[in-house]
Amino acid sequence: MLNNVKCLVYGYGNPGRQDDGLGVELALRIENDEHLSKYVDVDYNYQLNIEDALTISEYDLVIFADAALNIDKSYELNKIQPAHTITFTTHELSAESILALCQDLYNKKPECYMLAIRGYEWEMGLPMTSRAKCNLDDAYTFLTEFIENQFSRCIAGKGI
């Protein structure tokens, strides 16, 4: 926590399925970063769960990180809004749905972003592709600067 701003980086995906684990790998990098880990909490899982609404309700700033197949850049950051979506299984629960549940159940609306990291292959039991690793490096560098800028804005009194 810095200047009373609580920040969470939540990575999700399956590390056993090649590039699908990009979100988890990013979260692990943040967790192992001696500087950032002092100010940012980290969580990760295979997929988002309904219980994550309670988790994010305890933060001011939440950055979800996941692998993405359909983006043109190595990574993409977008601010997300709450969205009530109905899915057949909880396996498809979106970050927007988690934010909507957080707002409905806990009357909290943290500022949330989705950091999509470009992946290429999703085969079981194979290592992450080299191109995805390069995208992970780019996303990590970007996220480090983004978080530091967000905290600088708070210190300057400009909010998150």
PLM region descriptions:
Residues 1-119, 126-138, 143-160:
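N-terminal catalytic or cofactor-binding beta/alpha core of small enzyme domains
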